[in-house]
């Protein structure tokens, strides 16, 4: 992708997703950034450490997010919903066999 070198697209059950080349999806990087307590460059460094990425790769994800915020926010929402459904199913199963 010419505007965002280092970003590629993966196909999967949830559709086409922006991702770092040889790395996590952009939405995963953004989600980690939202969850760290730090802000600014320290937040980027913290996310890089958590994800075992170079700071420059986290910055690539941030740059992509700044241009496609709505798309990435929708992917985060979909992932959160899928996680909640899976946890609910697990709890129901545990109650059934408890």
Protein language model annotation of sequence segments:
Residues 88-98:
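Short, functional C-terminal segments
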Residues 71-86:
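Short Lys/Arg-enriched helix C-cap and helix-to-coil transition segments
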Residues 23-40:
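Short, amphipathic alpha-helical "recognition" segments used to contact nucleic acids or chromatin
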Residues 46-49:
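Short alpha-helical "recognition helix" segments of helix-turn-helix
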Residues 55-67:
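Major-groove recognition helix of helix-turn-helix-like DNA-binding domains
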Residues 7-28:
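Short, Lys/Arg-enriched anionic-surface-contact patches
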């Amino acid at each position: 992708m010419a505007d965002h070198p280092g970003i590629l697209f993966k196909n999967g059950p949830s559709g086409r997703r922006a991702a770092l080349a040889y790395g996590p999806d952009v939405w995963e990087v953004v989600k980690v950034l939202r969850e760290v307590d730090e802000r600014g460059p320290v937040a980027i460094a913290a996310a890089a450490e958590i994800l075992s990425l170079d700071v420059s790769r986290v910055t690539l994800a941030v740059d992509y997010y700044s241009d496609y915020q709505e798309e990435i926010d929708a992917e985060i929402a979909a992932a959160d919903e899928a996680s909640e459904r899976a946890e609910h199913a697990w709890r129901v199963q545990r109650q059934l066999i408890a």
